[in-house]
Amino acid sequence: MGLPELTFSLEKAAGTVSARMSAGAVALILRDAKDNGVYTIHRESDIPAQLGAANVTAIKRAMIGYINRPSVVYVAVIATAAEISAGFAALAAYSYDYLAGPVDMPASDATTLSGLVKAQRKKRYIGKAVLPATAGDDEGTINFVAAGIKSGATTITAAQYVPRIAGLLAGTPANCSATYAALDELTAITPEADPDTAVDAGKLILVDDGRKIKLGRAVTSKTKLAATDPEMLKKIKLVAA
């Protein structure tokens, strides 16, 4: 499949007003010593006042969106020593489209979240997890792989940036694609040596076209299809539809 050719469509401009107004919900699991609990965030003033700076930044990144802002951001704040599964369980009563984890999330947490989402999707759960470097081979796991991310003088890890990606995907209307969505705040990345191979391996990557840094082809981590599986399981837009 690889990256798409740089062709442009008028679909965005031709979309209906109702479709443009549509936006999904984001859920974040964050670890913090204070303000533990679940919060519903519609605006920056809803962010708990005592959260650490990195967690506040994560929420603000999730709120940026793309064509639209996310309809809402649900934030489960768990204790610093709590299991990631506790945050997932705390969000069980909430309906959301994209989930992201703590900004310092280790690989073990990402693997756990991928497994939890995969199990829940068998019960008609619609959420998808945006996780750093997690090859889940599942339509419910979005494997965000990026390095050398910079916004001016600030270096950002993939784990710190997944809330931004989750918010961008949630802010993409159903009649549009997140492929080549511009990330205007970014100034540098380490480019993939072979972008097409990365995309075919189920990696959601960043690309630099020399003018802007953008999202690559909007794919899920699904790479192996059974005989009865449709090709659309590899594409975020069609899985989300």
Could you tell me what each predicted segment is?
Residues M1-V145:
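Small-residue-rich
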